[in-house]
Structure formats: C-alpha cells, structure tokens
C-alpha cells in the first residue's frame, strides 16, 4: 500500500482555508518527531505526509488547540495519532491522551492505528467502549494506559469510577466532532471535559464542521489554530454519484435485487436510516436468496466486531447498515455505496459516500430517490456544490 493509501493527486488539490501561522512540513523528518515514531510511520506505509498531516501534526505537537477539517481518506486518524504518540512520555504509565469517537468501531480502529504507528515505542493504548466487559476495562486502566480511545459513555463512567485517572492527561481529541457534538453525546463530552486538567489541549477533527459545532468549540478551546478544507472541496473527487428514480418506497427492493450482481463485483455498503429497516431489508434479501450481512448499533459488540472482520477480510461482500458504519470506518475494497434511504441529516451524506473509492480508488454512490426524496437530493447537491446524475445502464463498467 504505497504512501499509507493516500491519493496524492486528489490530496494536492485540496484547498486549505487555514490560520496564517500554519507552515507546511513536506516530510515527516522535518517535523522533529521521535526516531522510534518515525520508524513506526514508515513501517505503516507512509512515505510523505498528506495535506492535512503536513499542516496539523506540528501545530498539535506544539500544544496548540487545533480544529482540523479534512475529508475521509486523507489520513486524519494518523494525524492525531502521530501527534499523541509524539507528546506522550512512555516512561510514565498514566493516561496522557484521550480520544473520543461517536462509534465503538471507530474507537477500536483508532486504537489499532495508534498501536501500529507506536509499534517501536512500547506504547499502551486501550479501546474503552460500551458493549464490552467492564472488568477488562478496569484491569487495563488500572494497569496504566498512555492513550485511551473510547466512546463518551464508557469513558465518562470509567472516569467517575476513578479507574481512568485524568491528572496526567494533556490532550483531548474529539474525532468526528460533528457527530459527537450532536445532541446525543454533548452532555457526556462536557462530563468528561469537566474532569480533565484545566490546561488540557483540545483537538477537534472532522470531515464536516457545521457552524454550530465551531461555535460550541469556543467553549473549551483557546485561540485554536484552524486547518480547514473549503466546503465545496468536500465531495470526494473521483467519486461518481448517481440517483435511481423509484416511484414509490415499495419499488426500492426490486431495484436493489436487479443491482445485486453489480454490487458483488467488489464490496458494497447499503445504508438505511433505521435499525428496523436494516433488519427488514436483510431478512427480505435473504428470503430472496441473496447473501448479505448487516450491522447496526443495537447488536452486541462481539457480533458487530465479527461482522466487521468478515467484511474487512472480504468474506462478506454486501453489508447493510445504519449510519453507525458511516463514520470513519476504513475498508479498502468498498467501491460502491447505495443509499437505500437518503440520509436524514445531509452532513452524513459525505460520511456515507466517503466510504466508497477511499484513497483515490474509483468509487460509485447510488441514491434511491422516491418522489418525496427529490427535494432532499437537491438540497444535498446545493449543500456540497455537486451534481448527482441519473444512473446510466452500464454502471457495472464504472465499478469494475
């Protein structure tokens, strides 16, 4: 995987709307990183920093509060992982950096990136997530973890129970901040933040930063440095977006069955808006003798993990999911995303289709649109300054 899988051509075109004091560091060597961390970076497959890495890593390592906005597949996770690994002292077995993510899968993925990049540093990093054994969390945290990557509920719980000690924490990272700061997690984040030392550095990372999120960050960030991608750059380049007009909801299923052979050319993800719809569609597809797997937030964590693993390894080729999957989950082979339901929140559109064609691979997104959905589709087009065309007959050629 050359260059950690980042698409250089698309990366060079990203236009940053960034604080004036931010300098660009064209190589990892020029960032004054620890030798053991550099070894981990190169072993991971990175050769040179992506656009967001070349700007954000040094600012974060300097201790600046940072808002970094970059689209999926530009190396966002490695940006803050490298920064955390640079600032922690592995000789002190206490939690020094904390990452909060909106989903358990994302929290686990961040932990594995940290462990891989920190391979030569003897780093301890634990994924502290709901749906798993509390006893295991307590054992790991009592042993001492340099970095904790978790979901807000479980992290807040472990802090309250005094197993996650906060006095040495110097950095808090909010990943997929737009989702985290939506109503669901806002209270829990404030809860966690209250326990952190007053001088804790805050790093906010997300593909989309609506104004209300930026507004809220002022509450716990001091003079943040901003590294922002312009709004109209946000639809991933090289990604073909189509819609299929289905007169009514009932016709979506037949349309999906007609497309099934196309789906299995590579791997595909199908998004529905509710957990119930995911279960319904999965059952209906299986009744019609189609092989599909499915995942949503109601499932036990173990089951979600094994479904993810099967999908990552390519054992299952079509995954039906809710937006729990849409945020930051990196599966290389996905080159087709189907929005069986258009997302109810337009910010989620980019997170969903950002799965397909990650890292510059060709990707196709297909939206099923009933007459009631036309307005939502137009709204998405306007919001992202993009054009979504009617799907051509030869869609299979575009994917293969």
UniProtKB/Swiss-Prot annotation:
Question: What protein family is recorded?
Answer: Belongs to the DEAD box helicase family. DDX48/FAL1 subfamily.
Specify whether NADP is a keyword of the entry. no
Name the GO cellular-component terms.
Answer: catalytic step 2 spliceosome; nucleolar chromatin; nucleolus
Residue ranges of the motif Q motif: 26-54
Localization, per the record, is: Nucleus, Nucleolus
The residues that the entry says bind ATP are 70-77
Output one GO BP term. mRNA splicing, via spliceosome
What residue stretches are annotated with the Helicase ATP-binding domain?
57-227
Gene3D superfamilies from the entry?
P-loop containing nucleotide triphosphate hydrolases (3.40.50.300)
Identify the coding gene: fal-1
The UniProt record lists the Helicase C-terminal domain at 238-399
Where would one find the signal peptide in this protein?
none
Name by which UniProt lists this protein: ATP-dependent RNA helicase fal-1
């Amino acid at each position: 995987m050359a260059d950690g899988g980042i698409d250089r051509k698309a990366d060079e075109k990203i236009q940053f709307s960034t604080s004036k004091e931010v300098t660009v560091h064209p190589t990892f060597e020029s960032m004054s990183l620890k030798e053991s961390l550099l070894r981990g970076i190169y072993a991971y497959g990175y050769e040179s920093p992506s656009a967001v890495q070349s700007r954000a890593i040094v600012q974060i390592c300097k201790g600046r509060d940072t808002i970094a906005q970059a689209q999926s597949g530009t190396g966002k996770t490695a940006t803050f992982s490298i920064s955390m690994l640079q600032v922690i002292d592995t000789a002190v077995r206490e939690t020094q950096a904390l990452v909060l993510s909106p989903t358990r899968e994302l929290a686990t993925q961040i932990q594995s990136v940290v462990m891989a990049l920190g391979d030569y540093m003897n780093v301890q990093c634990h994924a502290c997530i709901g749906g798993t054994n509390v006893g295991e969390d307590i054992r790991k945290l009592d042993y001492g973890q340099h970095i904790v990557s978790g979901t807000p509920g479980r992290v807040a719980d472990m802090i309250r129970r005094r197993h996650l000690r906060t006095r040495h924490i110097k950095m808090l990272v909010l990943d997929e901040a737009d989702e985290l700061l939506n109503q669901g997690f806002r209270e829990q984040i404030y809860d966690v933040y209250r326990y952190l030392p007053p001088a804790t550095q805050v790093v906010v990372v997300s593909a989309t930063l609506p104004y209300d999120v930026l507004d809220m960050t002022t509450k716990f960030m001091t003079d943040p440095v901003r590294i922002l991608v312009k709004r109209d750059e946000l639809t991933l380049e090289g990604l073909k977006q189509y819609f299929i007009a289905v007169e009514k909801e009932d016709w979506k299923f037949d349309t999906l069955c007609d497309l099934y052979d196309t789906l299995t050319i590579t791997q595909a993800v199908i998004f529905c808006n509710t957990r119930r719809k995911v279960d319904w569609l999965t059952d209906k597809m299986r009744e019609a003798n189609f092989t599909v797997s499915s995942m949503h937030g109601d499932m036990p964590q173990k089951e979600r993990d094994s479904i993810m693993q099967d999908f990552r390894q390519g054992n299952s080729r079509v995954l039906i999911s809710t937006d729990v999957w849409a945020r930051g989950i990196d599966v290389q082979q996905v080159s087709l995303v189907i929005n069986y339901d258009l997302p109810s929140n337009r910010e989620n559109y980019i997170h969903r289709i950002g799965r397909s064609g990650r890292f510059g691979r060709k990707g196709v997104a297909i939206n099923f649109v009933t007459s009631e959905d036309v307005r939502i589709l137009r709204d998405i087009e306007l919001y992202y300054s993009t054009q979504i065309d009617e799907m051509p007959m030869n869609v299979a050629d575009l994917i293969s």
